[in-house]
Amino acid sequence: MADGLNMGNLSLNDSQHAPAGPGNTGRAAYIPPHLRGRAGGANVDAAAAAAPPPGPAAWNGPRQGAPPRGGNWANANASDFSPRAPSGPNGNNSWTPSEGQRRPFDPHAYGHPGHGGSYGGSQGASTRGSGDGQWRDGKHIPGPANARLERELFGVPNDPTKQSTGINFANYDDIPVEASGQDVPEPVNAFTNPPLDDHLISNIKLARYQTPTPVQKYSIPIVMNGRDLMACAQTGSGKTGGFLFPILSQAFQKGPSAVPAQASGQMSYGRQRKAYPTSLILAPTRELVSQIFDEARKFAYRSWVRPCVVYGGADIGSQLRQIERGCDLLVATPGRLVDLIERGRISLVNINYLVLDEADRMLDMGFEPQIRRIVEGEDMPSVNERQTLMFSATFPRDIQMLARDFLKDYVFLSVGRVGSTSENITQKVEYVEDVDKRSVLLDILHTHGTSGLTLIFVETKRMADALSDFLINQRFPATAIHGDRTQRERERALEMFRSARCPILVATAVAARGLDIPNVTHVINYDLPTDIDDYVHRIGRTGRAGNTGIATAFFNRGNRGVVRELIDLLKEAHQEVPSFLESIAREGSGYGGRGGRGGRGRGGNANRDVRRMGGAMGGGAPSFGGGSYGGPGGSYGGGSYGGGAAAPSYGGGYGGASGGGGSYGGSYGNPSGPTGPSSWW
């Protein structure tokens, strides 16, 4: 009966079940499945005898013609640790050296503390950064090209997820530029060496950048000449490249800084637990630091510089492991950076460059105590021993006064109508009562369709979720982003928006501050902000890099506090001013507008260097509040900075009747002290 059971050549009389030999003294050796049923009666016993026995010793046998085994984590280019190498099982070589080939532990194989900026760069070994470049014998040696990584960082030609320059990019040459300070360097007109490093220029070409923008033309020589900088440039004008290009170029030319001598006792398995970055970039939101980090990876490709990013709301363990592998350029939010400093995992003693991006918000909206602690309360070099760079689209006067504490002999750079908007953006203002906003929004979306990306701004987190759900119920593919969402939810929402799977994004202004999202064709201010500077930043999400865009604002009498500034903004950008705005402005002449926060915005000369304006911030100073546009009183803080010994209170109602009234910024939920919660990060 056994002879009849044969299913697909599997028989009970198979050799693996047959007696081993005469007398049935034992069973045959086990036959692996891939050797069963071999034609011609292969000598399976010999094959089985040749098979390696189980256990770790099987992998340690001597090899002929193969490189010596060994692990060198700091040298990814070593032939015995390359993925899918030709020798070894599964294409991988041994993890354990064989007897006779075992080498003594070499601490220098993991990176020498004097040769890698922070951790890596072991005497000629790769730091495994953005492209495995090296700093060896005082020279920068770029790593080999990596086609997969190039596609990830730079995309492919005509990649829809990578925005190219628009039809109006050439108009940037007509933008007015004002640079004030002593001995301002001459601008550059092309990406050339000098002043830039050749390797950086090759990465700029990979990114398909043709010519520098106005802010880059001036910031590159200013930073390369060792000067501090306060730069104002309209949204979408290339500010990120304005500080990354000179910082990375000098890093490629000068090499890493030596780790302090006392750090040598902090090594663990050849690695230091504490990072010693040479450049620090601070920004207010998680999304913005991630965006800057992506740009840093792009331009540090194939170099020895390893960029890292840390921010709140994400797993701190993975961020610690990231900086342990090497950290030369650190992009961070202030809160998470303070946390890592307290944990003893980051030292600022080697900082050569400090960058504050969106600096006006960083200093104004509750981060000032944390920034002062980072800059003045830790081991960061003093203002005279480092370069400090501040970038933003708006720099109101009182924020300039605060910023002077962090700068030395700086150059003030004003590019374009700072605090204004690009003429590439077509601005439309519609009179819409609150109860009609949803129906008008649907009309706009049906009219414009979803061919491009549409960004809708609301004031509250609750409204962001409610409006997103409403649009989904109306069969519009929408998603939302705000401060109460987890970091993973925010990243997923942004990714779906960037890839156009959800071409409509509902966002709070704080969450989307500074984001460079390609191909946003329409920005809708569903809730108009109470601050004209916020309006500038919101609509600046479109019309970037010379591309054109549309910005629509829903206006009603509840927004009359910004009506005068809005009219001035529209006139400056040569946009149509609706008649209802003029009539409401005449009705509300008693309000006078706040001129930005407490009179700091457009009425406060947000694009002028305060050093050239004369006067002090005391009693004889020009009036800032509503006084720029009428209204009683009007002196900022009652003629003194802040109106008292405590932190300044911005406003005092419309017209800025006194600086002592009503604190601004409370609506943003930010702390007055360093330990309070913050909705910014």
Curated annotation (Swiss-Prot):
SUPFAM superfamilies: P-loop containing nucleoside triphosphate hydrolases (SSF52540)
Biased composition (Low complexity): 41-50, 669-681
UniProt keyword terms in alphabetical order: ATP-binding, Cytoplasm, Helicase, Hydrolase, Initiation factor, Nucleotide-binding, Protein biosynthesis, RNA-binding
Helicase ATP-binding domain mapped to chain residues: 220-413
Compartments in which it is found: Cytoplasm
Molecular function terms, GO-annotated: ATP binding; ATP hydrolysis activity; eukaryotic initiation factor 4G binding; G-quadruplex DNA binding; G-quadruplex RNA binding; mRNA binding; RNA helicase activity; RNA strand annealing activity
Domain annotation Helicase C-terminal: ranges: 424-585
Motif placement: DEAD box: 357-360
Catalytic reactions of this protein: ATP + H2O = ADP + phosphate + H(+)
Region (Disordered): 1-144, 586-619, 661-681
Pfam families attached to this UniProt entry: DEAD (PF00270), Helicase_C (PF00271)
Enzyme Commission number(s): 3.6.4.13
CDD domains: DEADc_DDX3_DDX4 (cd17967), SF2_C_DEAD (cd18787)
InterPro entries: DEAD/DEAH_box_helicase_dom (IPR011545), Ded1/Dbp1_DEADc (IPR044763), Helicase_ATP-bd (IPR014001), Helicase_C-like (IPR001650), P-loop_NTPase (IPR027417), RNA-helicase_DEAD-box_CS (IPR000629), RNA_helicase_DEAD_Q_motif (IPR014014)
Span(s) of short sequence motif Q motif: 189-217
Annotated Gly residues bias: 113-123, 589-604
Signal peptide bounds: none
Biased composition (Polar residues): 89-99
Any one GO CC term of the record: cytoplasmic stress granule
Listed GO biological process terms: cytoplasmic translational initiation; negative regulation of cytoplasmic translational initiation in response to stress; positive regulation of formation of translation preinitiation complex; regulatory ncRNA-mediated gene silencing; spliceosomal complex disassembly
Gene3D superfamilies, alphabetized: P-loop containing nucleotide triphosphate hydrolases
Binding-site positions, ATP: 233-240
Domain notes: The Q motif is unique to and characteristic of the DEAD box family of RNA helicases and controls ATP binding and hydrolysis.
Family: Belongs to the DEAD box helicase family. DDX3/DED1 subfamily.
Function: ATP-binding RNA helicase involved in translation initiation. Remodels RNA in response to ADP and ATP concentrations by facilitating disruption, but also formation of RNA duplexes.
Protein name (database record): ATP-dependent RNA helicase ded1
Gene (UniProt): ded1
